Curated annotation (Swiss-Prot):
Gene: hoxa5
Biased composition (Polar residues): 68-99, 114-127, 172-183
Entry GO CC: nucleus
Family matches, as PANTHER family: HOMEOBOX PROTEIN HOX, HOMEOBOX PROTEIN HOX-A5
Region (Disordered): 65-144, 162-183
Protein name: Homeobox protein Hox-A5
InterPro entries registered for this protein in UniProt: Antp_homeobox, HD, HD_metazoa, Homeobox_antennapedia, Homeobox_Antennapedia_CS, Homeobox_CS, Homeodomain-like_sf
Role summary: Sequence-specific transcription factor which is part of a developmental regulatory system that provides cells with specific positional identities on the anterior-posterior axis.
CDD domains: homeodomain
Cited Pfam families: Homeodomain
Family indicated by similarity: Belongs to the Antp homeobox family.
Localization annotation: Nucleus
Main location: nucleus
Lineage, opening ranks: Eukaryota, Metazoa, Chordata, Craniata, Vertebrata
Length: 281
C-alpha cells in the first residue's frame, strides 16, 4: 500500500479522530494500538491536515521510510530467539522529520532466522527447504531452536536417504558387467581363421604345411592326370570348387610335377640299369 493511497484516504475523511487506522500487530508491544490520521501526519506537514497532498517524504536508504508498521525482523535478533505466533514489528532509523508510511512485507528470511519471522514467512521457508531436499540432502539442522524447523530437517533427511540408497542399488549390477566386458576380449569376424590352411604361424615362424582332405587330393590327382600344367582360368575354377586358394593349387601342381619327374627319372634309371646289365660286349 503506497503513501498516495493513505493520503487520499485521510483526505477523504477530515475528522481524523473519528476514523482511526487500526494496527493489527503485536498487542504486547509498547507502541499504542490505535493511531489517528492527524497524529500521523502532524509532524510531517506541521499544520492541520485538510485535503490531499501528493508530496512523498523518502529516506536516504530506500523507497520506504522508517518506523514501518509491518511484519518483519530486527537486525539485532539472533537465530536462537523464541518463536512468536504474531508478527513482530521492527524499527529503522528514520529521518529527522519523523515521517512514517506503510511498506510491503520484506523478502522471505533465510533458514537461520525462521524462528523470529512470521508464520507466513516460515511456511515459505519450509516450502523452499522441501524443494531443496529433493535435489540435495539436508546437511545440518538450522541453528535456531525452533522445534518445527528441527522436525522439518529430520523429514528432509528421511526423504533424502531413500534417494541415496537407490543409487548404489542401481549401480551395483552394472559393476560386474563392466568387469566382465573388460576381462573378456571381443572377437571380431576378421580375427577368426576362415580356413586351417591360412595359418601363417608355424613352429619356427614358417608357413604351416597344408593338409588336404581326401576329396581335394582325389580331385587334384584327376586334374593332374589330364593336364600337367593348368591355365589361370582352370586354376580359379578348381580353387572355387575345392574351397582352396589359387596359390595352394599352383603349389600343389608344382610339387606334383616334381614328384612325377622324380618318379619318371627313377623308372628310366631302373630301365637303363636293367638293360645295361643284360648287355655284354
Amino acid at each position: 500500500m503506497s503513501s498516495y493511497f493513505v493520503n487520499s484516504f485521510c483526505g477523504r475523511y477530515p475528522n481524523g479522530a473519528d476514523f482511526q487506522l487500526h494496527n493489527y500487530g503485536d498487542h504486547s508491544t509498547a507502541n499504542d494500538q490505535y493511531r489517528d490520521s492527524t497524529a500521523m501526519h502532524s509532524s510531517r506537514y506541521g499544520y492541520g491536515y485538510n485535503g490531499m497532498d501528493l508530496t512523498v517524504g523518502r529516506a536516504g536508504t530506500g523507497h520506504f521510510v522508517g518506523n514501518e508498521r509491518t511484519q518483519g525482523y530486527s537486525p539485532s535478533h539472533s537465530a536462537a530467539t523464541t518463536p512468536s505466533v504474531e508478527p513482530v514489528r521492527y524499527t529503522q532509523s528514520a529521518n529527522s522529520t519523523g515521517t512514517s508510511s506503510l511498506s510491503p512485507p520484506p523478502d522471505p528470511l533465510p533458514c537461520s532466522s525462521v524462528a523470529s519471522s512470521s508464520p507466513v514467512t516460515e511456511t515459505q521457508s519450509q516450502h523452499r527447504a522441501v524443494k531443496n531436499s529433493i535435489t540435495t540432502p539436508c546437511s545440518t539442522p538450522c541453528s535456531s531452536s525452533n522445534g518445527g524447523t528441527l522436525l522439518l530437517n529430520r523429514d528432509c533427511v528421511s526423504k533424502a536417504s531413500p534417494l541415496e540408497e537407490e543409487k548404489p542399488a542401481g549401480s551395483a549390477p552394472t559393476t560386474p558387467q563392466n568387469v566382465s566386458d573388460s576381462t573378456q576380449p571381443q572377437i571380431y569376424p576378421w580375427m577368426r581363421k576362415l580356413h586351417i590352411n591360412h595359418d601363417l604361424a608355424g613352429p619356427e615362424g614358417k608357413r604351416a604345411r597344408t593338409a588336404y582332405t581326401r576329396y581335394q587330393t582325389l580331385e587334384l590327382e584327376k586334374e593332374f592326370h589330364f593336364n600337367r600344367y593348368l591355365t589361370r582360368r582352370r586354376r580359379i575354377e578348381i580353387a572355387h570348387a575345392l574351397c582352396l586358394s589359387e596359390r595352394q593349387i599352383k603349389i600343389w601342381f608344382q610339387n606334383r610335377r616334381m614328384k612325377w619327374k622324380k618318379d619318371n627319372k627313377l623308372k628310366s634309371m631302373n630301365m637303363a640299369a636293367a638293360g645295361g646289365g643284360g648287355y655284354r660286349p
